[in-house]
Amino acid sequence: WAENGFRQVTNSKREIPTPEDVKGLRLRVVGSPIFIDTFRQLGADPVNMNWGDAVTAFQQGVVDGQENPVGVLVPVQIWQYHKYSTFWNYLVDPVIFYWNKKQWNTFPKDIQKIIREAAQEAGRFEIALCRAGLDGDKSLNILKNEFNHVMEVPEPVKFMESKGMTVTFLSDKGRQAFIDATKPLYEKWVPKIGEDLYKNALSDRGK
């Protein structure tokens, strides 16, 4: 597996150090029901729209903010629309490699091994790419030493701040406040997702 990075929230109104600060904000979110439920639980007004419509809504002041990983925030130059960004790591975007089992079984074992190793390598590269500059030098060194890749923006937070954004990081206590505020969602969604899958996801968290 790989990932697109941890999703952060940006907006044009205020910093968001506590769950109470989310209340009343109109935010563009992914159309998945669990995303919408999360922001409604926090008191926001989540809106599902494509990115082109979202940019127009930001410019017109119809929508206050959005949520996306840093790997999206920098390329779209989010500072053109929003002054505030809160790094709360509320969700990580997993990228899972799938293959048709029937077709997979037609490959010789040595080809399966090559494909599997290539997928693992691609996943390691993607994870490092999305975490670069956010975990000290760890991911930057992986990219440089293993893949001969140098990031154009090696320190995304400082880069965003240089563009005039205020970037807020949550303390452990602050992050726990958001966890507590969204606990009712666990009761709703864990049975739907499956207890085993939920526990496996928790055990893989941070790897």
Predicted features, each with a name:
Residues 1-207:
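N-terminal secretory/targeting leader peptides
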